Amino acid sequence: MLEISARLEEALNRAFIKVFPQEDRSSKTSSILTGSNLVPASKPEFGDFQINCALSLAKEIKQPPREIAQKIANQLQKDNDFVRMCNPPRIAGPGFINLSINSKTLISEIHVRLNDKRLGVPLKKFSTDKIEEGKSNNRVILDFSSPNIAKEMHVGHLRSTIIGDSLARILEFRGYEVLRLNHVGDWGTQFGMLITHLKEVVPEVLHTKDVVEISDLVNFYRQAKKRFDEDQIFQNKSRSEVVNLQAGDKESLIAWQLLCNQSRKEFQKIYDRLDIKLTERGESFYNKFLVDVINDLKNKKLLINDQGAQCIFLDGLVGKNGKPQPIIIQKSDGGFNYATTDLAAIKYRLTIPPHGDGACRLIYVTDAGQASHFSGVFQIAKLANWIPTDCQIEHVPFGLVQGEDGKKLKTRSGETIRLVDLLDEAIQRAKNDLKNRLNTERRSENENFIDKVSTTVGIASIKYADLSQNRISNYQFSFDKMLSLQGNTAPYLLYALVRIAGISRKGGDLNVSSHNIQFNESQEWELIRKLLQLDYIIAEVEKELLPNRLCGYLFELSQTFNRFYDQVPILKASEPSRASRLILCSITADTLKLGMSLLGIPTLERM
């Protein structure tokens, strides 16, 4: 109801001008009247919107709040556009004004959605004021997933990957130009260590494709790390290898590239299963910019030499000992670290093309444990004046994935769970559930159907279980809960869609014009009002970057539809009620499909 809300805001502002003339307003009164005074109703029985400013105004202008509310309501009743949209305002409690959209307007909105693939969700309008040439107000960079080369993706990568993907989809749908970046860990001391170890143990890995699996690389990495920690000679060799790599030694670069490619292939298998689209741009991409970052910070007198290291001390940043804690930008041996690379990335991403990406909004999706790191890096970028006033840069943190015991999710042996194993188990459990249900229902389906449904349900359940949680919180992972057909789960939503698809197949083609759509039952109006909330919810997710708000809406919509389905005849109703109710079924299905696609969740016609 974004458009209706905007028109009501305009009508309300016109009423304010009449009831509270500009010349009679105090600064406090003006502040109240120019605030956000129209809000969605807190409960369905209060209507669609509420105006709550009378109580605040009462203290300022010394009048009873109900009297103020009545004056505003009376003036709204004189506004032609308001009267066309709304039933007469109702005063409630100490001075709340409750507004209900009239049936004619609701039916008109439903009819518009019949022919609108966007289902009433407008494209965002972007200002072009004060934008440098080459920049765009709608260009967003989403940094998410970001696994490390030579390591397998684990359950910890799941949240960043699917939260980042869903936010990218929602922002793209709203009209943003989104660059999805995979900032993989493809550089650093660990490569010198790994290459040195592989040269001695399995040298063929470093010049031949596909000799080892990613799981083998992980084991080799563990062996190399153990040697690095215990053997000074090996440690020195590893550091020399890093120097060779940084200097562009041909043999070292070939070995490094083979390791990256092998990992990249394994990552892509996961991304394909999850339907994730990403542009890889690893840490190594920014190597050529690191010296410029140091020089720029030096020229701006932000760096302090601390025992040979180049550091920045930020206000309020102290260590456990209570002393100021430095952020090291360049180590005493001349090397760089994560902070340096992240600063180079910020600078490049905000610089106009062809020397950068020209983005106006940067979003980093990582675990909450990195909040302090990003806070420091963002502060340094601001001090260096790399972030224009019209640009946003934000960290989107998320909590841990826990087991049902409330502890960090691990295997029985205490190992971190591989993401591929998690997906495989979800699909296998979904397949077992499906086969049991088919046996109970005495249904016969071929293996292709069983494989497709179990894969879709398994992947959808994993994604939805995560996205339906407030990302800021830790959440407890449970296969039983996420695969259940009851509650706020992917199978519940998928089943609602399958149910609607069955009704639509029996209902036949729809051919209904606006003048003969007719609704009479309370369940119909409840469903209509819920359907018309989609645009508001998506705008809210765009602003707050909380995908669980969309999940909550889709669950409530499914519940509302199921009540409508259970309590109101559809296929057996007489015309025009039959066609009108089939229209509601169709728009509900379209809304669920759109919402789930924005979450990156696949759907089914049959289960």
From Swiss-Prot:
GO cellular component terms, alphabetically, are: cytoplasm
* GO BP terms: arginyl-tRNA aminoacylation
> What's its top-level EC category?
ligase
**Record-linked SMART domains:** Arg_tRNA_synt_N, DALR_1
Which compartment or compartments is the protein found in? Cytoplasm
Task: Decide whether keyword Repeat is in the record.
Answer: no
Superkingdom, according to UniProt?
A: Bacteria
Q: What is its EC number?
A: 6.1.1.19
- Chief subcellular location equals cytoplasm
Q: Name one GO molecular function term.
A: ATP binding
Q: Which UniProt keywords apply?
A: Aminoacyl-tRNA synthetase, ATP-binding, Cytoplasm, Ligase, Nucleotide-binding, Protein biosynthesis
Q: Which reaction does it catalyse?
A: tRNA(Arg) + L-arginine + ATP = L-arginyl-tRNA(Arg) + AMP + diphosphate
Q: Where is this motif: 'HIGH' region?
A: 147-157
InterPro entries given in the database record: aa-tRNA-synth_I_CS, Arg-tRNA-ligase, Arg-tRNA-synth_N, Arg-tRNA-synth_N_sf, ArgRS_core, DALR_anticod-bd, Rossmann-like_a/b/a_fold, tRNAsynth_Ia_anticodon-bd
**CDD domains, A to Z:** Anticodon_Ia_Arg (cd07956), ArgRS_core (cd00671)
Q: Does the keyword Transmembrane apply?
A: no
Which NCBIfam families does this chain map to? argS
Subunit annotation: Monomer.
Q: Spell out the family assignment given in the record's similarity comment.
A: Belongs to the class-I aminoacyl-tRNA synthetase family.
This chain belongs to the protein called: Arginine--tRNA ligase
Q: Which organism is it from?
A: Prochlorococcus marinus (strain NATL2A)
